[in-house]
Amino acid sequence: MNRRQLLRGSVAVSAAAVLPRAADAQSGTALTFSPSYVRELARALATKPFAAPDEKLPEALKNLNYDQYRSIRFAPEKALWRAEKLPFEVQFFHRGFFYKNRVDIFQVADRSVTPVSYRRDDFSFGEGLGQWPDADLGFAGFRIHAPINKPDYYDELCVFLGASYFRVVAKGQTYGLSARGLAIDTGESKGEEFPVFKAFWLEKPAPSASSMVVHALLDSKSAAASYRFTIRPGQTTVFDVEMALYPRVDLEHAGLAPMTSMFFFGPNDRKDFDDFRPAVHDSDGLSIFNGRGEQLWRPLNNPHDLQVSSFTDVNPGGFGLMQRERNYLAYQDLESSFETRPSLWFEPIGDWGEGAVKLFEIPTKEEVHDNIAALWQPKQPLTAKSEHIFTYRLHWGADAPRADALARFTRTGIGSRGDDSKLFVLELTGDRLKGVDPKTIKGVVTAEKADISNIVTQPNPATGGWRLSFQCSVKGQASIELRAFLAQNDAPVSEVWIYRWTP
């Protein structure tokens, strides 16, 4: 078992065992859906005592190993809306293995709510799984398919499976990092709380629809919430998210728009790794457009000890965990194809006030572990027994949706210059640097508690960009905060590179 599987499947979090009014739907009583339907369920759920999720399963399913669980497959021809040839269709995940929590799924058509029923015949089962009586087991999650690459083939577009995790791809991409509905107490000594999506409502799309709407009900010990996801696939897949949060207790460390990724090693951090591949990561950096108009780039690390970075802000412009390196030769992994992993950009809608972008870098010795997390944490606690509304967009694609007015950093390389110093070599690209007089470009580098020397800026004819290099004294330092950018006539012409060096 690894951390990625643990976080997405086996999180022992409680959720209310019974959905308000869900029993009516399952008994055949017609329910009418409205825009506030799930929001009212979340509001009501937050007023009730917290109850554990339904994990009841036959022993044969509860004790499945990884390979046995993977042998259970949903029949594609049974996909929801397949027969109607709609622009989206849905397949479902069986419960078992780490995915024991029951997730209720409903279809919304013409404002009428009907449950999506579990049918054993919709699945094929591998050999040696044992026997269990027929019963309504519900589902573990679902995935949406759409013709994003070819008009005649429905590719997997997104997956909702495990806790409040979901993964998404755009055209030509493969799964990489994940988003979550909500994070609570990430990085706190008392331990993190993992909310769960306990029910979904899938709006039936029109035959000509270019988007699909999914509603979700989230629950945890500390809060309940509703979500409305409007999913628009394409060259970049966009999620419009409307969230209504109802805390049961004051949330001092709420993580909004949380995202989770993996950084094993790269050109800036190859120590301790004997591997034929030059780099292994789902994301290589955190990009931030802050409320002061700065454009920041923070390369990721796989540190020896947990590292938490906080970037305070007011009304952020956006942030994201990005996979900037898109060249196969940078990875040379034929199976994982890290160059096709999506970047994920968070775009706030409206006034988000004071808070901080938080970055968590967790040590890992295996690439199967998700060890990177980023989120927005409001400065003020989210008060109990109140409604907190958040609206934002998530952009899954090759890059951030914002135009880069400034040159940006594309590679961070670090090498030793003896025991006392490190050589940093930073590559940049961007139209802002094309055709400029090299004599007018200056590298600006600062460091806390360390001396900087040999700052050199020069065009890089091999890339068509620029290179900034410098040396930094590191002797006796537990960590060093570094900051660098290129300037012309004292005005920035590049984003700001920020980095925490650790031994």
From Swiss-Prot:
Annotated GO MF terms: carbohydrate binding; catalytic activity
Family annotation (PROSITE patterns): TAT (PS51318)
One GO process term, biological-process aspect: beta-glucan biosynthetic process
Coiled-coil positions: none
PTM description: Predicted to be exported by the Tat system. The position of the signal peptide cleavage has not been experimentally proven.
Alphabetized Pfam families for the sequence: MdoG
Pathway: Glycan metabolism; osmoregulated periplasmic glucan (OPG) biosynthesis
Gene Ontology cellular-component annotations: outer membrane-bounded periplasmic space
Signal sequence, renumbered to the chain: 1-25
Subcellular location: Periplasm
Keywords associated with the record: Periplasm, Signal
Family statement: Belongs to the OpgD/OpgG family.
Cited function: Involved in the biosynthesis of osmoregulated periplasmic glucans (OPGs).
Protein name as catalogued: Glucans biosynthesis protein G
Source organism of this protein record: Bradyrhizobium diazoefficiens (strain JCM 10833 / BCRC 13528 / IAM 13628 / NBRC 14792 / USDA 110)
